UniProtKB/Swiss-Prot annotation:
Record Pfam families: PP-binding
Entry-linked InterPro entries: ACP-like_sf, PP-bd_ACP, Ppantetheine_attach_site
Domain of life of the native organism: Bacteria
Species of provenance: Streptomyces coelicolor (strain ATCC BAA-471 / A3(2) / M145)
Every Carrier domain range: 4-82
Keywords assigned by UniProt, alphabetized: Antibiotic biosynthesis, Phosphopantetheine, Phosphoprotein
UniProt pathway annotation: Antibiotic biosynthesis; actinorhodin biosynthesis
This protein's name: Actinorhodin polyketide synthase acyl carrier protein
Length: 86
C-alpha cells in the first residue's frame, strides 16, 4: 500500500508552497481552519495540490482540488486517491 499523507507532511507542503503568512501558526491544530482564514489563496492551494500529486504519484483534477476548503479536506482527498491507487 502507498504511504499515506500525514498531517506533518501536509503542513510542510503548505509552508513550502505558500510560506509562513503574517501571524499564521500552522504548528497547532490547523486541519479544520479554512484556507482563506490562514491566508492561502487559490493559487497557493493549487500549487500545494500539484506538489502533493507529484510527490505521492496521484492525480487530482484541478476542479476537484480547487473546491477543498480546509487542510483536512485536502488531506482526505490525497489519501483517498492513494487508497484508490493501491
Amino acid at each position: 500500500m502507498a504511504t499515506l499523507l500525514t498531517t506533518d507532511d501536509l503542513r510542510r507542503a503548505l509552508v513550502e508552497c505558500a510560506g509562513e503568512t503574517d501571524g499564521t501558526d500552522l504548528s497547532g491544530d490547523f486541519l479544520d481552519l479554512r484556507f482563506e482564514d490562514i491566508g492561502y489563496d487559490s493559487l497557493a492551494l493549487m500549487e500545494t495540490a500539484a506538489r502533493l500529486e507529484s510527490r505521492y504519484g496521484v492525480s487530482i483534477p484541478d476542479d476537484v482540488a480547487g473546491r477543498v476548503d480546509t487542510p483536512r479536506e485536502l488531506l482526505d482527498l490525497i489519501n483517498g486517491a492513494l487508497a484508490e491507487a493501491a
